[in-house]
Regions:
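Helix-to-loop junction immediately C-terminal to a conserved catalytic motif
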Residues: 50
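Conserved ABC transporter NBD signature motif
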Residues: 58-70
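Conserved ABC ATPase "signature" region
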Residues: 96, 111-130
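Conserved ABC ATPase signature
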Residues: 134-138, 142
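Conserved catalytic motifs of ABC-family nucleotide-binding domains
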Residues: 155
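Catalytic Walker B motif of ABC-type/P-loop ATPase nucleotide-binding domains
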Residues: 159-163
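ABC ATPase nucleotide-binding domains
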Residues: 226-227, 233-265
Length: 265
């Protein structure tokens, strides 16, 4: 089954075209890496798939349903969380919020079955040891893994992640990338991941889609990540460099020394 299917999809935002005439599909269980410069339409596309944004024309299906009919199948991790860190929530409570939202509970007493699922989700992302620590006291990488656990508690079939590696140091990037790889291997969840820096994620990417308010390229990493394609979006300084059997993609937003990821040749 197609996890996501888009045909001639045009998304508007406040009357302006944000993304025009895009056609693509994602097979269930596969990972799509969504690449493009600022303002390319990446976040708008994610929000439209998640039914947070509804101004579009053309066809968009999520597991053969309209996006808003498939919301219970979708987990979403935004680039910036909306939690008020002045509220003293523990890591466990933040994760449990994902289960409370899905179950319809609105009171402050967290049901035991949701707490158990929250503990399991924290264990999955390697953070059992911080479950009782305040969320606001965690490092950036730990916070991101807690937010991943919060999205996983509802057992989604599709996980949408907006810049999950942004503003993280190299060590935290590696930790989050490892968790994403674990999700792919052990859960088989379809993922769509937006990124400015594609290199740390390429080992889990089945397809890459490059957009800049329209579809520039879509296909396997080695099909999309070519000098001519990257330069057409990022300019003459962008390039793809073969190093040790891998390809490093330099777009101007990243530096080669910041990470050890690459794209298979």
């Amino acid at each position: 089954m197609k996890a996501v299917l888009a045909k001639d999809l045009t998304i508007t935002y406040n009357g302006e075209v944000a993304l025009e005439g895009v056609t693509f599909e994602i097979e269930e269980g596969k990972t799509l890496l969504l690449l493009g410069p600022n303002g390319a339409g990446k976040t708008t596309l994610l929000k439209t798939i998640a039914c947070f944004h509804r101004e579009y024309r053309g066809e968009l299906r999520v597991f053969d349903r309209e996006p808003c009919e498939a919301r219970e199948l979708i987990g979403y991790v935004p680039q910036s969380h909306s939690l008020n860190e002045r509220v003293p929530l523990t890591a466990l409570e933040v994760v449990a919020m994902g289960g409370i939202y899905r179950s319809g509970f609105v009171h402050f007493k967290i049901p035991p079955e949701i707490l158990e699922k929250a503990e399991d989700a924290l264990a999955f992302v390697g953070l059992s040891n911080v479950k009782d620590r305040l969320f606001r006291e965690l490092s950036g990488g730990q916070k991101q893994r807690v937010l991943l656990a919060r999205a996983l508690i509802s057992d989604p079939k599709l996980l949408l992640l907006d810049e999950p590696l942004s503003a993280l140091d190299p060590s935290a990037r590696a930790e989050v990338s490892n968790v994403l790889g674990k999700i792919k291997r052990e859960r088989g969840i379809t993922m769509v991941i937006t990124t400015h820096d594609i290199n740390p994620l390429l080992e889990i990417g089945d397809k890459v889609m490059l957009i800049n308010r329209r579809l520039i390229a879509f296909g396997r990493p080695e099909e999309v990540l070519r000098d001519s394609v990257i330069k057409s979006v990022y300019g003459p300084l962008a390039r793809v460099i073969p190093v040790g059997g891998k390809l490093f993609c330099i777009t101007g937003d990243t530096h080669l020394h910041r990470h050890g990821g690459g794209c298979p040749r």
